[in-house]
């Protein structure tokens, strides 16, 4: 058989092993894995490189439509491709209107036409004002529903995202359980975090350490514990977003051991930045839950290596620079990290701490694809989409602002020496990013809908 593409001589991350093997691609799908596969129209030599499944980033904010001056599809998905991401799962907030019904998600689809460099799945929102319309988003094909039990949204904007109270969460989780949809939750105690934050502002405590102190670990743990129980009673599958503390992970592990259907994610910034670095970097490193101290970070690494965290995500949530101005307590909370997930975590987890390549592949791609039902994604296996990223190990570079593809070329990772590089990203058999050529093809990304899997 003649193939469209054969990738030769790379160390390929398979589901339970990594070995030097060739991959054949035909019609955008992985057709064969082995040696001496035959002829192809194109042959790529991946000698000395790690060939990973393209990253499935399960937590991305693209603020188009309505706030494309924060981040748009064109810039955001180019940054993703440059960072080795081939599929993103897009959050239902930051854009206006928030993605909370059929009309708003159709606006997303229209806004993205001709702009997607990578593939994208969508999450719907569970908010205080759409509980009777959740079925609309399920019918369109979202892969889950996101909600906040922490305070969120601009009360002065009618169609912005909104947090839910316990009653709204419970009723929404009941409906989502009936629909077979997971609920994803931002877990922080709203009232306590809000009051601690206001108290700090009144007293003039506005440093990074003060911000972290205003959102202590117990506020995350309490919220996780609460939504775990409510989701269990409601009969809904739960995914806990961006867990920032070992204690928070322990709550998920305990529930899982008791038989509850629950998963969790975390983000690179909780593993590679600490509060002292946050103080030095400033508002670019502000997020919620916040970046915590070094002891907390060490505990997170232990949980990651123990297999208690299901997937790693960017939580890419940028904004215009003026929203990061001023003191840390007032600045927008959100990190621009889409482009730096794979290389930073390959360096920190694999090269510096000895994580196995199969575990890396599961954390960056396979598990997220499984959690959200992306059946064609996340694995290098025959029949799956031919989505790959080439990683050059032990190849250090210093990230600069000019390297970034974001709408606003800022990130807390700028200035960091990263010990591995993404050299090529392939989506369904086509090179969408190359370290030498840039972006050689027009945007070919597609939306992935649940019912079309």
Swiss-Prot record:
Which EC class is this protein assigned? hydrolase
Q: According to its UniProt record, which reaction does this protein catalyse?
A: (S)-allantoin + H2O = allantoate + H(+)
Please give the pathway this protein is involved in.
Nitrogen metabolism; (S)-allantoin degradation; allantoate from (S)-allantoin: step 1/1
The record's GO molecular-function terms, alphabetically, read: allantoinase activity; cobalt ion binding; zinc ion binding
Question: How is the cofactor bound, as the UniProt entry phrases it?
Answer: Binds 2 Zn(2+) ions per subunit. Can also use Ni(2+), Co(2+) or Mn(2+).
- Listed Pfam families: Amidohydro_1 (PF01979)
Activity regulation comment? Severely inhibited by copper, and competitively inhibited by dithiothreitol (DTT). Zinc concentrations above 2.5 mM and cobalt or nickel concentrations above 1 mM are inhibitors.
- How does it get modified after it is made? Carboxylation allows a single lysine to coordinate two zinc ions.
Q: Which Gene3D superfamilies match?
A: Metal-dependent hydrolases, Urease, subunit C, domain 1
Q: Per UniProt, where does Zn(2+) 1 bind?
A: 59, 61, 146, 315
Q: How does it assemble?
A: Homotetramer.
Family membership, please give it. Belongs to the metallo-dependent hydrolases superfamily. Allantoinase family.
What is the designated name of this protein?
Answer: Allantoinase
């Amino acid at each position: 058989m003649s193939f469209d593409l054969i990738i030769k001589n790379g160390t390929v991350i398979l589901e339970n092993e990594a070995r030097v093997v060739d991959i054949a691609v035909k019609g955008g799908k992985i057709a064969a894995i082995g040696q001496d596969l035959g002829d192809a129209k194109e042959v790529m030599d991946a000698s000395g490189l790690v060939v990973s499944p393209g990253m499935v980033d399960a937590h991305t904010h693209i603020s188009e439509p309505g706030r494309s001056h924060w981040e748009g599809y064109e810039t955001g998905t180019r940054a993703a491709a440059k960072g080795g991401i081939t599929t993103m799962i897009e959050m239902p907030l930051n854009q206006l209107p928030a993605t909370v019904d059929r009309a708003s998600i159709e606006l997303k689809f229209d806004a993205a036409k001709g702009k997607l460099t990578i593939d994208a799945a969508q999450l719907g929102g569970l908010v205080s004002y759409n509980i009777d319309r959740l079925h609309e988003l399920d019918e369109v094909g979202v892969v889950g529903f996101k909600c906040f039990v922490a305070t969120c949204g601009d009360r002065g904007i009618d169609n912005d995202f909104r947090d839910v109270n316990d009653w709204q969460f419970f009723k929404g989780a009941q409906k989502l359980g009936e629909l077979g949809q997971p609920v994803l939750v931002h877990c922080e105690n709203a009232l306590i975090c809000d009051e601690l934050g206001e108290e700090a502002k009144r007293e003039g405590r506005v440093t990074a350490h003060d911000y972290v102190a205003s959102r202590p670990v117990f506020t995350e743990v309490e919220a996780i514990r609460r939504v775990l129980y409510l989701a269990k009673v409601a009969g809904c599958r739960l995914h806990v977003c961006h867990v920032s503390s070992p204690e928070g992970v322990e709550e998920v592990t305990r529930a899982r051991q008791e038989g509850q259907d629950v998963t969790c994610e975390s983000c690179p910034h909780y593993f590679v930045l600490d509060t002292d670095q946050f103080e030095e970097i400033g508002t670019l490193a502000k997020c919620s839950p916040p970046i915590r101290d070094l002891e907390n970070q060490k505990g997170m690494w232990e949980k990651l290596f123990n297999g208690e965290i299901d997937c790693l995500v960017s939580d890419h949530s940028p904004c215009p620079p003026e929203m990061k101005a001023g003191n840390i307590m007032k600045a927008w909370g959100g990190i621009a990290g889409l482009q730096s997930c794979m290389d930073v975590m390959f360096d920190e987890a694999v090269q510096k701490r000895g994580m196995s390549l199969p575990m890396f592949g599961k954390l960056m791609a396979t598990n997220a694809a499984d959690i959200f039902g992306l059946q064609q994604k996340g694995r290098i296996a025959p029949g799956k989409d031919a989505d790959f990223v080439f990683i050059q190990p032990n190849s250090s570079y210093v990230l600069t602002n000019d390297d970034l593809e974001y709408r606003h070329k800022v990130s807390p990772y700028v200035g960091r020496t990263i010990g591995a590089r993404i050299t090529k990203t392939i989506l369904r058999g086509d090179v969408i990013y190359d370290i030498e050529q840039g972006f050689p093809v027009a945007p070919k990304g597609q939306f992935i809908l649940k019912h079309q899997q």
